[in-house]
Curated annotation (Swiss-Prot):
Gene Ontology cellular-component terms listed: ribonucleoprotein complex; ribosome
Family in the record: Belongs to the eukaryotic ribosomal protein eS1 family.
A GO molecular function held by the record: structural constituent of ribosome
InterPro entries per record: Ribosomal_eS1, Ribosomal_eS1_arc
Protein source organism: Methanosphaerula palustris (strain ATCC BAA-1556 / DSM 19958 / E1-9c)
Protein name, entry field: Small ribosomal subunit protein eS1
Length: 198
């Protein structure tokens, strides 16, 4: 004989939980990005929330930028986050690929001035097809410039350079002297570890 579902107990469990409004960091305007539920606020720390830069900035042109935030502290019914990475949507990346051109990916690992160990993926799109030596030269310039930028700045400055596109524009200015370049994008960023500075 099948057991009856304990509906009453399940309802009581939900009643024991509370809703918390989740906010992005001050650098992104401290905008609320949704709500999450937990029985204990301590269980929220470390939880990851996702949204788009378009939703945060109320700018449809930035809907292709997916943002990830991790809850770092809770005060009352408010949960505050830190930015832990971004990624461009696959549809957007496909739209950048053109025939008879080259796509050049560079992977950069480095530590920021404030001790964040990060992994960045930078993609370069050329105007015409590049040969292997040209691809190697382009990748070297991008990797060197990005590694220097990361090492000389804190995580907040690196994030600002990524989401505003300023670092992509700086790299484009350097690389287009080597080969005709259409676009450079930091397509993905990710924190690999927590702060490592004592």
């Amino acid at each position: 004989m099948a057991k009856k579902k304990q509906i009453g107990r399940r309802v009581e469990g939900w009643k024991a939980k509370s809703w918390y409004k989740v906010y992005v960091p001050e650098a992104f305007g401290s905008t609320p990005i949704g709500e999450t539920i937990a029985a204990d606020s301590a269980n929220l720390v470390g939880r990851v929330m996702s949204t788009t830069l378009g939703e945060i900035a109320q700018d449809f042109a930035k809907q292709h930028i997916k943002m990830k935030f991790k809850i770092s502290r809770v005060a009352g019914d408010a949960a505050y986050t830190e930015f832990i990475g971004h990624e461009l949507t696959k549809d957007y990346l496909r739209s950048l690929v053109k025939r008879r051109t080259s796509r050049i990916d560079s992977h950069i690992m480095g530590s920021t001035k404030d001790g964040k160990r990060i992994h960045l993926t930078v993609t370069c799109y050329t105007l015409i097809g590049a040969n292997s030596s040209q691809i190697h030269a382009i990748r070297n310039v991008i990797s060197a410039q990005m590694a220097t930028f990361v090492a000389q700045n804190d995580w907040a400055t690196v994030v600002d350079g990524i989401v505003t596109g300023s670092i992509s524009r700086d790299m484009l200015a350097q690389v287009k002297g080597i080969f005709p370049i259409r676009r450079i994008e930091v397509i993905k960023s990710k924190i690999e570890s927590k702060v490592i500075i004592a």
